[in-house]
Each structure stands twice: as C-alpha cells, then as structure tokens.
Amino acid sequence: MFRLHSLSALAELAVGSRCYHGGSQPTQMKRRLMMVAFLGASAVTASTGLLWKRALAESPPSVNNPKSELGDKGKNKDEGEVCNHEKKAADVCLEPHPEEKKKKRSGFRDRKVMEYENRIRAYSTPDKIFRYFATLKVINEPGESEVFMTPQDFVRSITPNEKQPEHLGLDQYTIKRFDGKKIAQEREKFADEGSIFYTLGECGLISFSDYIFLTTVLSTPQRNFEIAFKMFDLNGDGEVDMEEFEQASCPGNIIRSQTSMGMRHRDRPTTGNTLKSGLCSALTTYFFGADLKGKLTIKNFLEFQRKLQHDVLKLEFERHDPVDGKITERQFGGMLLAYSGVQSKKLTAMQKQLKKHFKEGKGLTFQEVENFFTFLKNINDVDTALSFYHMAGASLDKVTMQQVARTVAKVELSDHVCDVVFALFDCDGNGELSNKEFVSIMKQRLMRGLEKPKDMGFTRLMQAMWKCAQETAWDFALPKQ
C-alpha cells in the first residue's frame, strides 16, 4: 500500500515538472498540476503516518513505547474482548516465578529513582523522610488534615532500594475524608488485629510522632532501655508511671536525643510535623491502662519492642510475595544484605553465589527467618562466642554456628538456613565462615541502618580538622622543655 501510493505520487510529480518547465501549458494548467502534486504528497504523508501508527500498535511495549491499546480503532468491541481473554490465558500459562517478575521492574529510570530515595533515607531529616514516604492524608469533619503512614509505608521508609509507588512522593498523598464508619470498615486494610500497629489507633495508621517513637524503639538496643528504666525508676521497684516514662522515651528525652533520627529532627510548624508533648492516647492506654494510673515494667516494654520487631520482619517477609508460605534463598539473602553497605560489584557476586548453590531451592518459611533474626538480636554475644572459637583454633563451620545459636539465643537454626548463610559469607569456599565480615554486616542488619549519622560527614570532618589545628597551635605556643 505504501509502495503504490509512493510510486503514483512520484509519477505525478515527474509529469508535472516536465509540463511546468516545458512552458507548453497555460498558467491554469500549471496551477492544477501543482495542486495535484500537493494532494499526492499529502496522501503519501497520511498513509505513512497510518502505517507507522499501526506498526507502533503491533510492537511489544517498552520504556519509550508503552502499549496503551490492544488493536486499531477499526476493531470492534467483541474482537477486543477475545484478544483480552487470549492474552490472559497466555499470561496464566507463561506466568514467571515471582522472583523473575521483580527483575523486570528495575529499568534505568527505576534505578535512578531508587538511588535518589536511598539518599533521602540516608541524609534527610525525619520530617522530609516522613513526608516523602507517607501516602495518606486524612481530612476530618471540621476540614483539618493530617498526614499518616501505613505500616507498609513505614517499612518502605527504612528499607533501601524499595521504590515509592508512582505518583506518590514528597507532599503527594492519597486523600481520604474522615468517616468513622467507613474508616472502621477499612481497619483490616492497614493493620491486623494482632499487630502492634493496631494499638496505635487511627486504623493502624502512623502519625509523625508515632514514626519518631517507633524508629527510636527500633534503633535503640535493649540494654539502653534497661539502663534508662533504672535511671528513672526513682523508688527502685522496677516500675515507672506515665510521667517518668515520658521523661525517658518521649519528645525531648534522653534516649531519643541519642539516636540519629532524634539528633536530626527539628520541629517544623509549617509542615505540621511537630512532636507532641506525649505518646498518642492509644499507646498510653496500651502501656498504662484506660485510667493511665498503671505501671510499666521493663519486661512489658521489651515485649513491646519484640512485637514491633516481629511485625516489621513479617511485613518485610510478605513484601517478597511468598509462595506456599516460603521465600526463595536469593530473597532471604537480599534481606540479610539490605543494610550492609556492600559495594554493588561485591553484592552482585554474593547474589550469584546464592544462585549457583540454590538453582532449585526449597525456600525458607517465616519461622526459619524469624529464628535467624532472633539469633541476630544477640549478635554481640555471638561475636564474643565466635571469637572464642577462633582463638581456640576451632573452625567456624555450620555445626559451630548452630551450637552458638542454641547456647546464646536459645533458638534452633535449620541446616538450610545455615547453608544459605555460608553460601553468602564463605568467601573461599572451604566451608568456614568469614567471621569479621559476617558479624559487621549482621550488626548493620539488626539496626536497619538507623544508627548511622544522618549527614555526609562534612561537618564532622571540619570539626575534627578544627580540633586538630587547635591542638597543634597549642603545642607550638608552649615552649619545649
């Protein structure tokens, strides 16, 4: 079709040109020939455009050519439905493994967006992190609005390489009007009844004050809370009331000011992200009872911390779309290395080791994953125990790791979990663990990167240089004896 139109148009142009330059035709004929030539060129352009549009419609989708239609405009509705059914059937037959689905999403644009979001997690203030990763703005009946995170948003805000959903970003939210009955019906959507997020109120949603409190709980070691409770337990009975607890763990307190989040936070009334004077009403009721006259023991608070860590780990596990309650070995390795800070080339090599060892892996259940992370909670004691083995000349093999887990953390590590860990950290392939690298990476994984300072180090570098210059000048000023 394109070839016929082109040949006819060129023939018309050739005839018109000869007649025009020959001078044998009158002026009216020349104009008529020019009009025919113009119409022929227009027909060629139109036919070329139609053919190009059809070629785009029939080509597979790509980054620059997203497929938005299933056929030409001339196709009727029934043909479109048949195509849809055939496409769905083909997708069912050729449905890839869940891990393969996740590989296809990381294009060039996605990688750059994830790098930008990782910088936000690493260097931005808590206010900006919250405003970027929160996805809901609830408007109440008087017209006042407040921004909230869902539990999934909270996990995404502390997990590297987890991309924010499209069209949601800094100060971009999904708007929800306050309707008590409707919100109550959607409660299960945000948090399960057994989840610690359910106790926060607001249907399991997380306000800015809750966000700071939860990150403080996650980033503070258990030993620090034990010391803080003893400091503010004035009568020494092992219990604190609400006033004493607010001094120890709420806005403006000692513990929060020692965390990287707390040191970076500044109240910003313009954005509405200011820390309130106390815990939310749901948490105070959870800790101190309905009348707020109860006592909180360190045992109960550490149980709250344990439940929070369990719920966050559960959300991380479910994010990998487990099949029959299991995730793949590579996904488990990704969970272990998420906060490692390992260079990309080495990270790729470690992932290839897993792929080589577990081509047809049997997967890991949540119970196996939770047991290993319970083992990691005692990583300092594990480090000491492994050092003793190393100094005694014993090899750090899988049996040794299982023995340390039983002795230190009181958990059983399955043989399959140990196989995955050794495939990651057995650098020379001799069946022995690289102790230092394993412990350093696992310490970062336990704290989820929340203990790192939220700056690029320039201020600390200048302070160190200034201190060095002062000491050097003082040494020059003093006479040598």
Swiss-Prot record:
Pfam (any one): EF-hand_8
Post-translational modification: Phosphorylation at Ser-124 by AKT1 impairs its maturation and stability. Asymmetric dimethylation at Arg-460 by PRMT1 decreases the calcium sensitivity of MICU1 by promoting interaction with UCP2.
Binding site for Ca(2+) 2: D426, D428, N430, E432, E437
Region entry C-helix region, spans: 460-470
Lineage, opening ranks: Eukaryota, Metazoa, Chordata, Craniata, Vertebrata
Protein's name in the database: Calcium uptake protein 1, mitochondrial
Domain EF-hand: 220-255, 413-448
Organism: Ailuropoda melanoleuca
GO biological process terms, semicolon-separated: calcium import into the mitochondrion; calcium ion import; mitochondrial calcium ion homeostasis; mitochondrial calcium ion transmembrane transport; positive regulation of cristae formation; positive regulation of mitochondrial calcium ion concentration; regulation of cellular hyperosmotic salinity response
Modified residues (Asymmetric dimethylarginine): R460
Domain of life: Eukaryota
Region (K/R-ring): 128-131, 264-268
GO CC annotations on file: mitochondrial inner membrane; mitochondrial intermembrane space; mitochondrial membrane; uniplex complex
Keywords per UniProt: Calcium, Calcium transport, Disulfide bond, Ion transport, Membrane, Metal-binding, Methylation, Mitochondrion, Mitochondrion inner membrane, Phosphoprotein, Repeat, Transit peptide, Transport
Record's compositionally biased regions (Basic and acidic residues): 69-82
PANTHER family for the chain: CALCIUM UPTAKE PROTEIN 1, MITOCHONDRIAL, EF HAND DOMAIN FAMILY A1,A2-RELATED
CDD domains named among the record's database cross-references: EFh_MICU1
